């Protein structure tokens, strides 16, 4: 590649990678291009990222088993998605960095700060052990998301999301869920 400055990462795929097509059509039409983009990026030494709203469990499996993708998000929970963070961590957390999956409406928009902290801690319990996890919302936060809920998410990370030298999150045990 002819880049003088390398980006931090390359986003491949897109917001609705699997929403508007079947897995078979994705494999036939999109996966070859996504794989090639990932190969090029990895060969130049930078990370790759897929953001795909909606049902994503099958996409996570494909990306983990058939590509060298670095990170995938937003790992939305039902009803908008189909992801179970603990299951994805167990199956693919050694291969992919998982990013998500705080519910943007039920928790961030309509929840209380305590709801946000509880959801953040649960996500860290489900996905954080051993690293390769980025706590994030399931997608963007709506315009009317209360500032105190955004601050609560930051608080949860600072208070409970600090790894020790063994890749553990020891502060999580202090939070009763």
Report the location of each language-model feature:
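Active-site loop segments of alpha/beta catalytic cores
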Residues: 1-177
């Amino acid at each position: 590649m002819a880049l003088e400055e390398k980006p931090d990462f390359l986003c491949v795929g897109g917001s609705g990678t699997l929403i508007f097509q079947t897995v078979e059509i994705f494999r036939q039409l999109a996966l070859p291009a996504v794989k090639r983009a990932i190969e090029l990026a990895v060969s130049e030494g930078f990370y790759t990222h897929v953001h795909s709203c909606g049902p994503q469990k099958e996409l996570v499996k494909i990306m983990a088993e058939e590509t060298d993708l670095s990170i995938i998000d937003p790992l939305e929970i039902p009803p908008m998605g189909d992801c179970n963070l603990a299951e994805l961590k167990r199956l693919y957390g050694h291969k992919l960095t998982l990013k998500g999956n705080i519910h943007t409406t039920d928790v961030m928009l309509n929840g209380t700060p305590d709801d946000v902290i509880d959801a953040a801690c649960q996500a860290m319990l489900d996905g954080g052990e051993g690293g390769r996890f980025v706590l994030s919302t399931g997608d963007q936060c709506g315009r009317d998301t209360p500032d105190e809920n955004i601050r609560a998410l930051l608080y949860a990370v600072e208070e409970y999301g600090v790894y020790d030298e063994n890749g553990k999150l020891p502060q999580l045990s202090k939070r009763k869920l």
